[in-house]
Swiss-Prot record:
Belongs to the terpene synthase family. It comes from Isodon rubescens (Rabdosia rubescens). InterPro entries: Isoprenoid_synthase_dom_sf, Terpene_cyclase_plant_C1, Terpene_synth_N, Terpene_synth_N_sf, Terpene_synthase-like, Terpene_synthase_metal-bd, Terpenoid_cyclase/PrenylTrfase. Binds 3 Mg(2+) ions per subunit. This is Terpene synthase 6, chloroplastic. GO terms for cellular component: chloroplast. A motif (DDXXD motif) lies at residues 433-437. GO terms for biological process: gibberellin biosynthetic process; miltiradiene biosynthetic process; terpenoid biosynthetic process. The Asp-Asp-Xaa-Xaa-Asp/Glu (DDXXD/E) motif is important for the catalytic activity, presumably through binding to Mg(2+). Mg(2+) 1 binds at residues 433, 437.
């Protein structure tokens, strides 16, 4: 599949040896190989390197000038030369800035047709043109530029008699290591090394290093990696690349699919209002990637062994904010290719692009964590029975789903207490929500609130029903158990805080019941200020913060940053829920953000328009949340802030399609994350 690449490299070597007057035996073998395999030069099933149809014929012309006796099939040769003429005509007629750059990049194929003085505007500080040894060598032959020569000497000093397709590639290759470690879920084992690479990359970013900013792939990867690790980087370079390289035909001549995918991922990371132009660019790139998927446009990358279709499909179907950590890691492991050969003018590869040891470690770690997670799920199922929750047939007692949301986000083996707190409280909120939303009487709702307020009560006499008795007893045991675990880590009692979290949730649920009963129509502000609490993420996330490691003082949990994180996360969940549940709640006579928005506009807008507006609102909330989570100088520890973002990802995944609790797709994901170990071919 790389025969065209091999033909090109072989002929280049023959020309060099002939010029130096060396290796006659090797020249003869090379010529024989070219003659035997020349048909591949026009074989459309072969992978075509960038500029091959111009560069390879130019080398054949040069071979003829040197009187090298090549006995080539005349039909194939004519076909090849016709392709060159058509490609040159296409580029000349196009006349775009992208095409001008492309023609400069493949300058070694243009020879004397080039205005080399104009091409030199692309020369970089290191003396190269496009960090390409071959283009730079062609420029030196034409102009005898000393900076070009110094660059070529530096490449030869580093690599000896053979140089790579791209040099230097240091920043990109190091970032590939970091990206691989993060995407495979094993970055926690290399935190010191990763920090060193990120600090050095940030230093280069601040200095405007050409190795970053003159290469779209490196710039996209550097921006995404630095921003997601809390470094203050502007999106301006990404916008510039999108305008210059993807403006007219989405993907220019200089950009391979790896670059397109990298820039697409970078364009998702919008944090600030002034970056909203990236939205349109991101949408255009998404459309392009979808078209390439449907037309099998990634066939070259797939032929190289890389499962690019799966990578692109994952990026499109699951935005970075709508996929749980463990779910993403498994997909990345399964799609990982240790070969990962790249194609520009020639093929090139690096162990930093695909590493067998990284893959082995990631599989071992994933499966080891799975064993722990399965045991914890069994423990949770025992806990359900011990607390008689299985007797409440009305409840969506989906222990596996509730545990899945914990294990898929807080996966490290040592964070078992945080996972169990998350899962148990998630199950309790599900059952309490059903009591308030579906099956409970007003008397039962008020009774449950009163029991939590009084706390020390005789459940045999104070509970108005069997199900309230079971719910309160299980809730009390859960709060006490989580409080005891947290006390060991925090060195102070936080039980009263967990009780307050639950009471806030119960009171907000009760207010919604009363609004529906009394047919009261709140303002949008009144609704949202209550609804983000009643969405009931507080009891799941907030107690778990005490169990992920860092000390959380009372001053921290009373700080505005803590409350902003909670409000933004919960508002995202509420808005996503209201979009998904609009028709059902409308039929039940219940108000939500969708129906209120339509009412506030005089009932003159359609639900489709309302959905767009609520989604836009949700986007702003999500971006504000991510900005807070990534903020380096903050009151709340990063490990705690991450939980707010993880839960935001959970709700975006669950409400992305149909009711997540009953989705067949989600059942399969639960099995992949918890039950099915990864088996490599």
């Amino acid at each position: 599949l790389l025969n065209k690449d091999v033909l090109s490299s072989t002929l280049a070597s023959i020309l060099a040896l002939h010029k130096w007057g060396l290796g006659q035996h090797h020249i003869a073998k090379g010529l024989h190989f070219l003659e035997l395999n020349f048909a591949s030069a026009t074989d459309n099933s072969q992978i075509t390197p960038l500029g091959f149809d111009i560069v390879f014929p130019a080398m054949l012309d040069h071979a003829a000038d040197l009187s090298l006796n090549l006995r080539l099939d005349p039909t194939t040769l004519n076909d090849l030369m016709n392709r060159r003429d058509l490609e040159l005509q296409r580029c000349t007629e196009n006349g775009s800035a992208e095409t001008e750059v492309y023609m400069a990049y493949i300058g070694e194929g243009m020879g004397k047709l080039h205005d080399w003085e104009s091409v030199m505007k692309y020369q970089r500080k290191n003396g190269s043109l496009f960090n390409s040894p071959s283009t730079t060598a062609a420029a030196f032959i034409a102009l005898r530029n000393s900076d070009c020569l110094n660059y070529l000497y530096s490449a030869l000093n580093k690599f000896g008699s053979a140089v790579p397709a791209v040099y230097p590639l240091d920043i990109y290759s190091q970032l590939c290591i970091v990206d691989n470690l993060e995407r495979l879920g094993i970055s926690r084992f290399f935190s010191t090394e990763i920090q060193s690479v990120l600090d050095e990359t940030y230093r280069c970013w601040l200095q405007g290093d050409e190795e970053i900013f003159m290469d779209a792939s490196t710039c996209g990867l550097a921006f995404r990696t630095l921003r997601m690790n809390g470094y203050n980087v502007t999106s301006d370079p990404i916008t510039k690349i999108l305008q210059e390289c993807f403006s007219s035909s989405f993907r220019g001549n200089m950009t391979d699919i790896n670059t397109t995918l990298e820039i697409y991922r970078a364009s998702e990371l919008i944090l600030y209002p002034e970056e909203r132009d990236l939205d349109q660019h991101n949408l255009r790139l998404k459309t392009f990637l979808e078209q390439e998927l449907s037309s099998n446009g990634f066939i070259q990358s797939c032929q190289l062994g890389r499962n690019i279709n799966a990578e692109v499909n994952q990026a499109i179907e699951y935005p970075f904010y709508a996929i749980m950590d463990r779910m993403a890691k498994r997909k990345n492991i399964e799609n990982y290719n240790i070969d990962n050969t790249r194609i520009l003018k020639t093929s090139y590869r690096s162990p930093n692009f695909g590493n067998k040891d990284f893959l082995s470690l990631s599989v071992e770690d994933f499966n080891r964590c799975q064993v722990i997670h399965r045991e914890e799920l069994r423990e949770l199922e025992r806990w359900v029975i011990e607390n008689r929750l299985d007797e409440l047939k009305f409840a969506r007692s989906k222990a596996a789903y509730c545990y899945f949301s914990a294990a898929a986000t807080i996966f490290s083996p040592e964070l078992s207490d945080a996972r169990m707190s998350w899962a148990k409280n998630a199950l309790m909120t599900t059952m309490v929500d059903d009591l308030f939303d579906v099956t409970g009487s007003v008397e039962e709702m008020k009774n449950l609130i009163q029991l939590v307020e009084l706390w020390d009560v005789d459940v045999s006499t104070e509970c108005c029903s069997h199900k309230v008795q079971i719910l309160f007893s299980a809730l009390k045991r859960t709060i006490c158990e989580v409080g005891d675990r947290a006390y060991q880590l925090q060195g102070r009692s936080i039980r009263s805080h967990i009780i307050v979290i639950w009471l806030d949730t119960l009171h907000s649920m009760m207010k919604e019941v009363e609004w529906t009963r009394d047919k009261f129509v709140p303002t949008m502000d009144e609704y949202v200020s209550n609804a983000y609490v009643s969405f009931a993420l507080g009891p799941i996330v907030l107690p778990a913060l005490y169990l992920v490691g860092p000390k959380l003082s009372e001053e921290m949990v009373n700080h505005s940053e803590y409350h902003n994180l909670f409000k933004l996360m919960s508002t995202c969940g509420r808005l996503m829920n209201d979009i998904r549940g609009y028709e059902r709640e409308h039929d039940d006579g219940k108000l939500n953000a969708m129906s209120l928005y339509i009412m506030n506009n005089g009932g003159e807008i359609t639900p489709e328009v309302a959905i767009l507006e609520i989604k836009s609102w949700n986007d702003r909330q999500r971006r504000d949340l991510l900005s807070l989570v990534l903020e380096e100088k903050s009151v709340i520890p990063k490990a705690c802030k991450d939980l707010f973002w993880h839960m935001c990802s959970v709700v975006h995944l669950f409400y992305n399609k149909d009711d997540g609790f009953w989705s067949q797709e989600l059942i399969e994901v639960v099995n992949q994350v918890i039950h099915q170990p990864i088996l490599l071919n």
